[in-house]
């Protein structure tokens, strides 16, 4: 009898552990079915402009299901079956969206135009879609690609990729493969950080990520993939490889430069030389543009304002766009210096800086938020999870409030998109002050333990 009691007690304890795990695993399958149903409807639409409210409403619904999934992954110890559901569903979501004919962004047509320009032996940093005599390079299905009055804004590695691909479905497929590559690298990073692999759901199921890459074909996935590879090599103490991958990421999109100081504190001077040499090597093919090499980037910085938040306040305080940009740059530099001084972990610094630049920038398209979403796998900040979901409100059409006036997003949509996030951040800052926490990353709920407590609340 004395031997039976411990055996029964152990059996009951195992049941208590397995029962919620099995229920949550089934729950994840149900969530995946719901998200798939949303994306099947989205992919079947022939004209998203005609059903924008339904499109955004369903994306927000998918976002709610996604957040429930993140909560379960954080709350429960899950097994192999749950991980398989997460990964298989991640592939299924992308396969469902790939055939979509109508997309919420037309950037892929600019990629295609840049690729045609290069195959015609022209320099994309010099010519632009409205250049005289280049009508034959246009896609008749979409004859007006974005930024038709400006040379390209994209760095050389992205441009080389555009040159190798010819069709719009081709761009979407390559973008999606790189996106799935991000899932793989995140799992390696989670393993290196001794964290549960199930946390990859925070990226793999995110609706903003899925719409940006599988549906729209944005090539930010190239920059994110190489950036995550750079971080993996950094945290596993392979500095030369990390700086090489960081250079490739910078050559895809410019945002990884935010983490340059974080990397420099962990590598030798020779590795910095490798970073610079790679950048120069990729720009060589386009140097015949001369002083026009950065014309597109300058035009972007000067003219584009879309879906920003804090920047509008900074511009109002400063009295000009240039003044607002200067304040934003100083805030970012201060954040970079603070994180370097505190020796913040690279993955945490990545979340803070990629998220911070989006809140301060005059332009924050929904797909830009994909830059920061991978780091929710390690620091699942409740406020930023919410931001990753509400960012789809940035797909609402911008309108002009007068003849000749620029297109603007409505104050209502911006308030719905950003307001709850700022309220959440302000609340946690206030709680931190009340409890007299030492000033630091905990104030915004971004410490490793703090984010889990915050999300659980």
Where are these regions (language model features)?
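Transmembrane-helix signature of polytopic, membrane-embedded enzymes
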Residues: 80-81, 85, 186-208, 237, ...
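Intramembrane catalytic core of multi-pass membrane enzymes that act on lipidic substrates
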Residues: 79-174
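Hydrophobic alpha-helical membrane-interfacial segments at the cytosolic entry of transmembrane helices
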Residues: 86-93, 266-288
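Aromatic-enriched
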Residues: 304, 381-448, 453-457
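Aromatic/glycine/proline-enriched transmembrane-helix motif characteristic
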Residues: 174, 183, 279-283, 299-366, ...
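Specific aromatic-rich, kink-prone transmembrane helix
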Residues: 183-188, 211, 222-238, 354
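Transmembrane-helix motifs of polytopic, lipid-linked glycan transferases
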Residues: 65-72, 164, 169-197, 224, ...
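Start-transfer (signal-anchor) and selected internal transmembrane alpha helices
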Residues: 2-96, 191, 342-347, 430-437, ...
């Amino acid at each position: 009898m004395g031997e039976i009691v411990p055996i029964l007690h152990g059996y009951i304890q195992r049941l208590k552990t397995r029962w919620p795990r099995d229920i949550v695993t089934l729950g994840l399958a149900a969530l995946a079915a719901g998200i798939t149903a949303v994306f099947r409807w989205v992919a079947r639409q022939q004209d998203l402009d005609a059903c924008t409210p339904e499109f955004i409403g369903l994306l927000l619904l998918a976002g709610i299901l996604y957040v429930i999934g993140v909560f379960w992954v954080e709350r429960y110890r899950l097994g192999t079956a749950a991980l398989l559901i997460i990964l298989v569903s991640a592939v299924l979501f992308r396969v469902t969206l790939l055939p979509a004919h109508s997309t919420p962004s037309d950037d892929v047509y600019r990629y295609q135009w840049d690729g045609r320009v290069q195959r015609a032996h022209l320099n994309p940093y010099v010519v632009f879609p409205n250049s005289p005599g280049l009508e034959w390079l246009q896609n008749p299905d979409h004859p007006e690609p974005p930024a038709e009055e400006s040379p390209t804004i994209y760095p050389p590695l992205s441009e080389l990729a555009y040159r190798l691909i010819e069709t719009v479905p081709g761009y979407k497929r390559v973008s999606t493969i790189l996106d799935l590559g991000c899932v793989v690298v995140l799992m390696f990073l989670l393993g290196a950080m001794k964290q549960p692999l199930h946390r990859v759901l925070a990226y793999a199921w995110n609706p903003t990520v899925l719409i940006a890459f599988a549906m729209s074909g944005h090539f930010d996935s190239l920059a994110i993939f190489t950036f995550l590879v750079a971080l993996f090599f950094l945290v596993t103490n392979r500095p030369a490889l990390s700086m090489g991958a960081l250079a490739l990421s910078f050559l895809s999109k410019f945002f990884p430069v935010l983490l340059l100081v974080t990397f420099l504190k962990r590598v030798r001077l020779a590795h910095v030389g490798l970073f610079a040499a790679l950048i120069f090597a990729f720009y060589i093919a386009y140097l015949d543009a001369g002083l026009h090499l950065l014309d597109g980037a300058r035009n972007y910085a000067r003219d584009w304002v879309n879906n920003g938040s804090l920047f509008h306040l900074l511009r109002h305080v400063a009295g000009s766009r240039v003044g607002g940009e200067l304040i934003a740059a100083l805030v970012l530099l201060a954040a970079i210096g603070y994180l370097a001084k505190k020796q913040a972990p690279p993955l945490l610094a990545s979340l803070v800086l990629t998220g911070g630049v989006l809140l301060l920038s005059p332009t924050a398209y929904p797909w830009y938020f994909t830059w920061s979403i991978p780091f929710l796998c390690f620091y699942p900040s409740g406020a930023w999870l919410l931001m990753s979901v509400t960012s789809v409100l940035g797909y609402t059409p911008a309108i002009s409030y007068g003849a000749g006036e620029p297109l603007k997003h409505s104050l209502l949509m911006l308030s719905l998109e950003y307001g709850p996030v700022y309220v959440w951040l302000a609340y946690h800052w206030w709680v931190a002050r009340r409890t007299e926490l030492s000033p630091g990353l905990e104030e915004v709920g971004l410490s490793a333990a703090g984010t889990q407590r915050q999300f659980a609340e």
